[in-house]
Amino acid sequence: MLAVVMARRSDLNFSLCRLVAVAVDTDRIMKVGLELAGWKKMPADSAVHIKGKNISKVLIGIDIGTAELMLAKQLECDAVIAHHPIGATAVNFYKVFDRHIDYMVEHGVPKKIAREAVEKLKERIETRNHANIYSDVVGAAKALCMPLVNIHQPCDEYMRQVILRAIKAGRTEYVSDIVKSISKIPEFRHAATKVQVSFGNQNNKAGHWTLVVAAGTNGGFNIAKAYFQHGVSTVIYLHIDYGELIKMREEKLEGNLVVMGHLGGDSIGLNGLADRLENLGIETVRVGILPNR
């Protein structure tokens, strides 16, 4: 199977077309996702749910349901890539949360306290997901004979690296400096949900700060509290539940919480994945993903 790839040469002001042979299967797609993060092992929140081969066109989205699978079929896609866990990965999602422990210990939180905070988070999410009906999307894909992959933590890790570089490249004296650096990233710039300081004040000194993403989900109240009580002044989350935020306000913790925005962050990871697939000659249909330019 052949795909046409456009290579731009701005200095000569023309486009060069070249034919590239495409022979990609779902295992190769997963490998590209892992390479994106610099990893070799597939985490518990990512999987090849339905295998496929000879893939030259894929639909990529953050949340995939039956409607997106039908759209992919209508658009003659050969496979679908979801970001958020589906099927068994939605049940096993909590198993990647231990990365929070590594983050906290790295930033001075005693391991025992870090583990206790993460266990509370794992219990809450595991209990919630145990009640979910998790087989519908994979079942629909089987009925449609549509290869299906979901890649969650590896894309989030790529997103973490992009954001970390952006923060370190700018000023970090004040919380507002961090907000400005993140807001310049194209996906956050295009988002309707702007980067905000949900707790604390943007005029505060940032002090010791930490970016807490690519550990499955946000750390909520208990993990933020552990950071604040052990020398971290500014915590950066992708998102936070309202109830967890209220707990922080009621306990009157001292610190700052920057919330970046879920769609903007996830779009960074999926754009990175889509760009690399296109480099292999795969056509991508990006659904609901914010632009990276």
Where are these regions (language model features)?
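N-terminal amphipathic/basic-hydrophobic helices that include classical n-h-c signal peptides
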Residues: 1-21
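Active-site catalytic microenvironments in core metabolic enzymes, especially phosphate/sugar-handling
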Residues: 16-293
